[in-house]
Amino acid sequence: MRCLAARVNYKTLIIICALFTLVTVLLWNKCSSDKAIQFPRHLSSGFRVDGLEKRSAASESNHYANHIAKQQSEEAFPQEQQKAPPVVGGFNSNGGSKVLGLKYEEIDCLINDEHTIKGRREGNEVFLPFTWVEKYFDVYGKVVQYDGYDRFEFSHSYSKVYAQRSPYHPDGVFMSFEGYNVEVRDRVKCISGVEGVPLSTQWGPQGYFYPIQIAQYGLSHYSKNLTEKPPHIEVYETAEDRDRNIRPNEWTVPKGCFMASVADKSRSTNVKQFIAPETSEGVSLQLGNTKDFIISFDLKLLTNGSVSVVLETTEKNQLFTVHYVSNTQLIAFRDRDIYYGIGPRTSWSTVTRDLVTDLRKGVGLSNTKAVKPTKIMPKKVVRLIAKGKGFLDNITISTTAHMAAFFAASDWLVRNQDEKGGWPIMVTRKLGEGFKSLEPGWYSAMAQGQAISTLVRAYLLTKDYVFLSSALRATAPYKFPSEQHGVKAVFMNKHDWYEEYPTTPSSFVLNGFMYSLIGLYDLKETAGETLGKEARSLYERGMESLKAMLPLYDTGSGTIYDLRHFMLGIAPNLARWDYHTTHINQLQLLSTIDESPIFKEFVKRWKSYLKGSRAKHN
C-alpha cells in the first residue's frame, strides 16, 4: 500500500476504492436476486410415483383389475415409452432440484369452506399438491425420466382402449383377449390338475369353478394362439430309438426300479414303461431347460403314482419340486414341495402344465381370497421324476401351449353344462344393498355368452358337433326370467335384457349384457339359418334393447356399470375406467357387425371422456 501511495495521489486512490466498493455491492445484489429457489421433489408433497397401471381384471385388468387393486380389467395395455425431449428448465436428476428464476411463497388454500391445505403461489398462479389433486379429481400421474431429466405425466384415466381389428368374426381373436392373463390373477387359486382350468376365489376362499373365468381362460389362449408366433418346442422323449429330433438325454434308473421302451398297440407306437416304488428315488430324466417352462407329457398309470418336476429357482438358486400326483387333492405346499392332484389317469391322457404358474401359485398359497404375492420364478427345469407303475410318452417343454389351455376350457364347458343348458355358479353372490342374494346354482348371461363364444370356436376348429350342440343348448336360460331360473329381465315392460347377475330387482349390468349378445352373434353366424334361428331371434331382440337403453348409461363424463340407481332409487354405480374402456371395446366390436350409427357415436363420445371431456351444460 505504501508503494502504491508513493506512485498514486490520494484522490485517485479514493476514487479507485469507491469504484471497487460499488462493483462489489452490485455483484452482491445480483447474486442475491438470482439465487435458485428449491423446488419440491419429494413426491409426498406433490407427485405420485406409482404408475398409471392398476394390474388382472375385467378384466376379467388389472394385478393385470387388481392384478391391479389390483383388480383392473386387462383391457389396458402398458404402452412402450417413447423418447421425448427434456423439459426446458425441468428437474435435473443429477442431484439438482433447482429451477432457476422461479419465486414462490406458501399460501393457505381453503377447500369448499371446509378445510385448509398448503399450496404454493407464484405471481397470479396458485399450485395445489398433486397428492390432493389426484384424490379430489380422481386423476392419475407419475414422474418419469427421459435422458436424465424428470417429467411429470398426467392422465385423466388409467385404462386404454384397444384398436379394433377388421370386422369381427366368430373364428377370430375375441376382442382384446390376447392381452388377458387369467391364470396370473390373484383371485385364481390355481389351475386345477384334474380339470385343467382355473379355480376362482373371488367370492369365496374355498375356491370354486367360475364359468366366466374358465371361458375367459379359453378365449384368451385361443386369441394368443392367433396373435403370437408359434412356440419353440424341445422334445425330450418319444420312446422311439430312430427319432433323431429328440435330445439324447438318458434316464437314471436306481436299484429296485425299472424302465424300458415297450410297444403300445392302442397308440401304434413305442412308449416308456416305468416301475418305481413310492419309497424309491424314482426314475428320472435330466432336462436342463433354462428358456421355456411349459411341460407336457402323455401319461397312463396302472397304480397310484406321480410325475415330479424339479426346478431351480430365483430364490437363492434353491430347488423346488412340483409333484403331479394321482389323487384329487387340489393343491398343497410344504417346505419346497408343491403338490397338485391330477386324478387317477388310468387311461392315456396328456398332462400340460405351466411350471411358472404352478410354482408361484404353490408358494403363494393362502387361506384367503387372494394368492400371496411372490417374486419367485423358475430359472431351470432340472429333471423329471416318475414314481409308481405306468407309462410315459412324448415329454416336451415349450414356450407356450395355448391350444391345450383352450381345449381344456372347451371340454370343461361340455362336461359341466347342466340339463337346462346352463353353467350353474355354485357360490353365493351379493351384488349390493337392496338386491336379494343370488344363492348357489344361479346362471349368468355373461357366462352363457362367453361360453358360447368359446364352444363355437372349438367347433369351428374341430368340426366336432358336440361343441356346437352344447352352444345351441346354452341359449335356453336366455328365454326364462330370473324367477324361473333364467337370465332374462324386461326393462319398463318393453326391452328384453340378459342379466349378468339375475337379481331381484333386476340390475341391468351393461358389460355382461353385451358379452351375452356377442355369444349369440357367434352362434347365429355359425349354426346357420335353421339351427341358429333361436339365437338369431334372441340376438335381435337384445340389440334393439341395447340401442334404446344405451343413453341411460352415459353420465356426460363417464359411464354407469348398472341401473341400480333407477331400480333401487339410490346413488348411481359409476363404472371404473377399466369397465368404461370395456364398454367402449364392446361397442367397437358391435359397430363392425351392425351398421347402426349409434355405436360409433357412443364410441367417439365415450373415448373423449377418457381425456377429460364432458358433455355441455345448460
Swiss-Prot record:
> InterPro entries under this entry?
C5-epim_C, C5-epimerase
Q: In which tissues is it expressed?
A: Widely expressed with highest levels in lung and lowest levels in spleen.
Q: List the residues marked with site Critical for catalysis.
A: Y180, R187, Y561, Y579
The record's statement on gene disruption is: Perinatal lethality. Pups die shortly after birth, apparently from respiratory failure. Mice show immature lung structure, lack kidneys, have abnormally small thymus and spleen, defects in inguinal lymph node development and in blood vessel formation proximal to the inguinal lymph nodes, and display important skeletal deficiencies. Mutant mice have heparan and heparin chains that are deficient in iduronic acid residues, and that therefore have altered O-sulfation patterns.
What EC identifiers does the entry list?
5.1.3.17
What's this chain's function?
Converts D-glucuronic acid residues adjacent to N-sulfate sugar residues to L-iduronic acid residues, both in maturing heparan sulfate (HS) and heparin chains. This is important for further modifications that determine the specificity of interactions between these glycosaminoglycans and proteins.
According to the record's subunit comment, the protein's assembly and interactions are: Homodimer. Interacts with HS2ST1.
Name of the protein: D-glucuronyl C5-epimerase
In its UniProt entry, the species of origin is given as Mus musculus (Mouse)
